[in-house]
Amino acid sequence: MSQTVTIQEPRPNDQRIPYQCREVRRAKGGFANRTYDYLYDPLFIVSSERDHAQANIQATLIRSRLKKVPNFRSMFSNLFHHPRYSMYWSKTDPVPLHVTREWRGQEAKHKEVLRLQAAMDTSFQMPKEKDEDPDVSGKNRYKFFDRPFLPFLQQMPLNVVLSPVKTQPLLLTPESSKYAIIPTKSTVATQTDYRDADVQTDPYSPEYVVCQDTIPELLTLANLTWGRGLPAGQAEVEIIERAREKRAWEATLPPLNDSVQAEKRRKMMNAMERKEWAFREGEIEKLQELRLEVLKQLLKRREEDQNELNMRHLNDQWYKLQEAKEAKVAQIRHKHVSDIRKLMGKGKNIEGKLQRRDIISDYSNFASQVYGPLSRLGRFPDNNSEDFVVRNHYLNTYEGLVELESSLPDFVTQPRIKPPKPQIITTKAGFLKRTARMDYELAEVHKALVDKKNKGLEGTKSLRFLQKNPISQARLPTPSLEMTSYEEGEIEMAVIYLQKLLRGRVVQNMMFEGKEKRLELILELRTSHALQEDDKLVKKAEKQVTLALQRQRNLHEDKLSVIENHLGDLEGRVLADMFDFLSKELVRLQEERRIHAFAMLAERQRRMREAEESGRRQVEQKRLQQEDMIFKEVIKVHQSTVTSYLEDIILNTEERTAEEQARKEIEKIAEEINNIAYEMENRRTYLQSEEIVAELVYSFLIPEVQKDFVKEKVRNAQRKHILAAHEIIHSNTETMLEEQVYKELQSEDFELEEEAESLDSEVPTVSVSKTSTIKPTQDEGEG
């Protein structure tokens, strides 16, 4: 028997643990292994540099530096040429640069070589090892503590199991429960390896003494035990009554030694046996009826369970279809809202002009996306906001707020504002103070220094935007006029006049060519614009006619549009009614097909159940027939057993009686023969003894010796013939064996040649060596 003690310890203060860490513990059941233990942990050991590289690869795969950056324009796109996100390689390395990524086994090998060299060379001095962090209060603080092992300090059984601590949500403890409460009670439970049913004993039975030649009726009920017949019921009472009747009937039977009433005894026993068998058959029928009722109940229960399971499957399928339908409707509605929003966005900017972002207006408008970004663009400002929720008694309850307000001083709720005193920079006489003047001069000097510094920086500052570098142009030369004679002036004036004529002619030619080229355009303008009054009147009349025709056309188009609208309305109504009728017909056909399918399934299930029921009925009938046959065979075996038992008893009795009589007769005859032999021995003479000896020698000894001599002579005569026959037989068998071995070797060589040819045909470069056949000679076989 083992005992298990459960000790419930007080729950430790869980407020010091961060909320996020507790959530991780609850979710994962413990902290996961660190990714870069092979670099930081000094206890992390790998066998070789290859394993170190493998650990580095695993850490790189686990801590992938590839990040997905969403594209706000196509965040919800499923198209291949408009991806939702792009991959970005993060430049931030999680491992600092001062941490080496090399295998630490090289340092260990170096230290091992130094140690071996120091062991071999006594003059070699080992370099002193310096601890990387010898500070006691640092990360190595745990190395300076040791807990002694006192095995007998506290007697605690090895199978003590501490009950797990149930985590509770973070609540602010009141002032009265700041310290851990010492429990006044501890629950200690014990558990055994045995059940109550295993240790339950029968009721107490006192000792008893049975008188001689008496059989108490109570002892005949020894087979009834507690739970198996006790406490007694109607069936047990009937069994007891039948046992009493049988004992009374046995008392009325004639005795066995009465040969006169043997036939009567046999008839009474046969009648009782038939009665018992009839009673037994009735019990078997009742038992079978009871089993049949139980089987019917089980079948009914199984059918109910199957129907319930089918209904559950149908309900689950219906719920799944409803959820899929709701999800599809929600998706359609979401897409509808998105499309409407896109259309409204396109309607605001019909021309499709690109507008530059106005940062000032965005930050001045508190309803812009700067202060409230849209979640559909991938910005979730309230993400993980539940981690920063402060659950405080003073903030979440009205009583806490009242208590907090009462505990605050007056200057918090009623602020006291003191106006600042003006700084006096003048004296009573109205002059500026020396300190104020010095401050003013220092401010001027500081401003001059800052301006000078900024000017120097502006000279060396690189230009952000391209600026035009003005290039100084040389000054044009001043025109000068030289005085000429009158004749030269006349000639120059004539030349200038000739040039004017030429230029005018050229311009005239150009105008003519342009008029010829644009003649069609000029004619087109003349059709709509007139310069003369008559032409203007004609054009005005044509314009009025055209406007009248346009008005008539517009009226005709309006009538046609009204007619088309009415026709479209009628067509829409007709189509709506038709589609409604078709959809209802489709639903009706689907329901009809579904009902037909259910009916077919029900019919199929009914047929399968009928087949199973008929099969079970046949199996039951076959089992009943087998039980009847078994019962008949058992009766036959019982009868044959009784018959064989009686036959064996009679035969053994006859054999024993005959053997006793034969033994008595043999003893009597042997006694008579012994008497005769003793009498003859007493009356025999010496000559009669010699005659008896001679008769024994001549009748038994000499014939036996002669018979052995004849047998040996015949054996010697047949020996040479047997040897010759052996030689002939063995020579023939050896030749036959040699021929058989030779044939087998030839068949093996033929098979090897065929395999070699097949291999040569498949792979020409492979050569197969043939085994040489050896034909054994007759001499070798004989040897």
From Swiss-Prot:
It comes from Mus musculus. Residues 748-783 are annotated as: Disordered. This is Cilia- and flagella-associated protein 91. Its main location: cytoplasm. Expressed in the testis, in cells involved in spermatogenesis. It is found in: Cytoplasm; Mitochondrion; Cytoplasm, Cytoskeleton, Cilium axoneme. InterPro entries: CFAP91 (IPR026720), CFAP91_dom (IPR032840). It comes from the Eukaryota. Belongs to the CFAP91 family. Involved in sperm flagellum axonemal organization and function. May regulate cilium motility through its role in the assembly of the axonemal radial spokes. Keywords: Cell projection, Cytoplasm, Cytoskeleton, Differentiation, Mitochondrion, Spermatogenesis. The gene is Cfap91.
